[in-house]
UniProtKB/Swiss-Prot annotation:
Its main location: secreted. This is Lipocalin-1. InterPro entries: Calycin, Lipocalin, Lipocln_cytosolic_FA-bd_dom, von_Ebner_gland. The keyword Hydrolase does not apply. Pfam families: Lipocalin. Residues 1-19 form the signal peptide.
Amino acid sequence: MMRALLLAIGLGLVAALQAQEFPAVGQPLQDLLGRWYLKAMTSDPEIPGKKPESVTPLILKALEGGDLEAQITFLIDGQCQDVTLVLKKTNQPFTFTAYDGKRVVYILPSKVKDHYILYCEGELDGQEVRMAKLVGRDPENNPEALEEFKEVARAKGLNPDIVRPQQSETCSPGGN
């Protein structure tokens, strides 16, 4: 059950959505690489298990052929859980698959500079799950980006219970 929770959370961190708008094909993938901070998250249905107590920055790296690697660490139930996920490039810009094609990952820009709304759809333990995450280049909360995230979540019929995990540069069981 914990593995399924970690897989679901990890996948949700590397997907994005914004009112069905895709970035221009020419927008460089380079813009996505580097350090991102998870600012908010939600899913439908709600993923069973505990929500992360804190998260480290998400690191996106380029792999050969246009694939991406995402790395992040969560503190869940007092335990540090490292997640590394490979996103396989598709024929659509800023659209990837994960877990042998079982999940589709969209990476789309927010209207707010240096923010993305991450979105994914796919199967988890035999059930269809949709997740959205708000990430930004700095750890500070941005009310405009959060409001846009809430609007997108509402429009997609996601759980209105928005989780805002604590930011942490490193994972420390028993403290942040």
